[in-house]
Amino acid sequence: MTTIASEAYIDDSVNFESFKLDARLLQAIKGSGFTHPTLIQSHAIPLALEEKRDIIAKAATGSGKTLAYLIPVIQTILDYKKSRTNGDEPGTLGIIMVPTRELTQQVTAVLEKLIHYCSKDIKVLNLAADLSTSVLNTLLSENPEIIVGTPSKILNILERNTDTVGIDDLKFLVIDEVDLVLTFGYQDDLDKIAEYLPLKKNLQTFLMSATLSDDIQSLKQKYCRSPAIIKFNDDEINKDKTKLVQYYVRVGEFDKFLFCYVIFKLGLIKGKTLVFVNNIDRGYRLKLVLEQFGIKSCILNNELPANSRQHIVDQFNKNVYHLLIATDDADNIKEFDDEQKDDIQVEEKNDETNTVVAEESTNSTTGIKSKTKNNYKQDKEYGVSRGVDFKNVACVVNFDLPTTAKAYVHRVGRTARAGKSGTAISFVVPLKEFGKHKPSMLPSAKKDEKILSRIIKQQSKLGLEIQPYSFDLKQVEGFRYRMEDGFRAVTQVAVREARIKELKEELLASEKLKRHFEENPIELKSLRHDKELHPARVQNHLKRIPEYLLPENARTDKKKISFIPFHKPNKVGKKSKNSKNKKRKGGKTDALKKF
């Protein structure tokens, strides 16, 4: 979020001084490296500050939506505090709602940078952490001007702390990533929150999103009054996306692990890599397999404590880690259901006689929906493929293909940001290869070819192309027996033990992050998340690649290798041995000389 936007989004005709911002805010903006606003900012900020309009904005990821609402919120709060004649401190003036804890941390981090020079006038409460009731009441009693959290967290404090939270002076309500908020099942929470807020009175509302679905219309009617709707034609902006090169590889289930081993061990990808898997077990299995070959990686999933997750993202952005395996099991559930229904409708049109098959498909869809939602409620505030600001990612590897075409867009959107180039590689399991290797099988891979066709169709509409990528199988085959050795050592029991061990370590680390490292921030750098778990039998010989397996251009030049004797010569040792023999043959020795 704080990264500099791509040139395709910058509006060179305007500068931030033209918005007549507070000098302290202006200094913080320049200190963050921003010289010109983006297109969304140059349109939204004047409408919000001068005309006091509600804003509904649709703009692509990385276009600067966060600053488009934070700058007006901060500026108006500063103006409001200056205009107050009485000395009473106002209550909460702004509420910002985001879909996940990760985004809560990110928005708070950007907010704290912007209020760096006016922190005495504006206090921020971050609801990402699980705070005890007493601590939360203490923080709320200080009347923070801005509260940031997920809808469920905001609703919780409104219901339980009605007397503590002063919302009589509330001026702003922001819902960031609206489409994702609705998809994550927060509609009921939003309806209840609306009962507590002075909507359509003095409340200015911002609804920000990368896409505008029909569901947003209900929020528009409930939360907004004569809003200004800002949309951008993505045709010009999508020219920047040509810097994203996309490939797909048709591979068997076991060959996914083989290709990952070859790619990372031979260093075929330069720079930081983000690998997406579809469930937690897959992430740990891949990590343990790579550990067999001495390849370090760290895990990011919804089981880890929120503090640890944020620390992992921060360290990845600071180049501490170069390989991050992220679990993206919270795919867009609603989109998944819609696509399943589309499949059923197509099948019914093509073959009207197969009504039984269609009914079975409907039943299975319902089963998937209910099963997924049950798991999904547990992970409601976790999201990694959407909105999280991974910086300078050179490559995204879809180790497991996502279950929807939209989820694919969000994943590959983590690279090729801010005008930089990037690569996306997706592994696709052909239907004929599905189920041939049971230990590495993933049920969702059965639909990989269908999902791929949707992805190709969607990308072609955007003027983008996904190219097939073919490995030199002769060179890859040489590594197969080593991968079979390494994969065999990573059993289901080893994966389970790895999950337990990692969770225990991260829980301890989370407490350290929470308490100890607040007092010792320097020691925070020493806390790492890519340590080897070692619950599986590690074979050290697999960490080294024999010369004959390497491509010719990667082998050592034989002409530069000098002669290396089998035994290390020890001239001193030989002399001492000979001298002993001579002494034995020579007979008597002079006692004085010996002394």
From Swiss-Prot:
Belongs to the DEAD box helicase family. DDX56/DBP9 subfamily. GO terms for molecular function: ATP binding; ATP hydrolysis activity; DNA helicase activity; DNA/RNA helicase activity; RNA binding; RNA helicase activity. This is ATP-dependent RNA helicase DBP9. Residues 568-586 have a biased composition (Basic residues). The keyword Glycosyltransferase does not apply. InterPro entries: DEAD/DEAH_box_helicase_dom, DEAD_box_RNA_helicase, Helicase_ATP-bd, Helicase_C-like, P-loop_NTPase, RNA_helicase_DEAD_Q_motif. The Q motif is unique to and characteristic of the DEAD box family of RNA helicases and controls ATP binding and hydrolysis. It catalyses: ATP + H2O = ADP + phosphate + H(+). One of its GO terms (cellular component) is nucleolus. The gene is DBP9. It comes from Candida glabrata (strain ATCC 2001 / BCRC 20586 / JCM 3761 / NBRC 0622 / NRRL Y-65 / CBS 138).
